[in-house]
């Protein structure tokens, strides 16, 4: 039996729990900001660092595929998908695919924010939940 999906699911549960824990541990006041999503910010930065570190080890075959699926796809995927975005962008830059990297980075941010805004608008105005 192939346990790939089980490894990813188990890692995802751990990563999601860690994200919740980190988010709850962080204060909402940060530096000069009265309300700053420090938990999400911290999770994204930590996740990017860890996926960079683990991504390099994966390329060098320091650990097996099952552990990579468990940790990178599962734990980090549950912790933050922003880390995958960072790794994908870095891979494009490393291959000197600069136009693709910039397009991906800008497109992800602009279209992601646009998607959130449209979803919010539709829920507010058409579902009737104000």
UniProtKB/Swiss-Prot annotation:
GO terms for biological process: cellular detoxification of fluoride; fluoride transmembrane transport. It comes from the Bacteria. It is a multi-pass membrane protein. It is found in: Cell inner membrane. InterPro entries: FluC. This is Fluoride-specific ion channel FluC. Na(+) binds at residues 77, 80.
């Amino acid at each position: 039996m192939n346990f790939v999906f089980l490894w990813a699911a188990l890692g995802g549960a751990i990563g999601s729990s860690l994200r919740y824990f980190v988010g709850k541990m962080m204060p909402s006041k940060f530096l000069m900001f009265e309300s700053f999503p420090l938990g999400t910010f911290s999770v994204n930065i930590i996740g990017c660092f860890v996926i960079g570190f683990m991504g390099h080890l994966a390329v060098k075959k320091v650990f097996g595929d099952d552990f990579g699926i468990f940790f990178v796809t599962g734990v980090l995927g549950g912790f933050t998908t922003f880390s995958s975005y960072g790794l994908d962008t870095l891979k494009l830059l490393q291959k000197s695919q600069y136009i693709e990297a910039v397009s991906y980075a800008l497109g992800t941010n602009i279209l992601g924010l646009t998607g959130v805004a449209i979803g919010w608008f539709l829920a507010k105005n058409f579902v009737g939940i104000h």
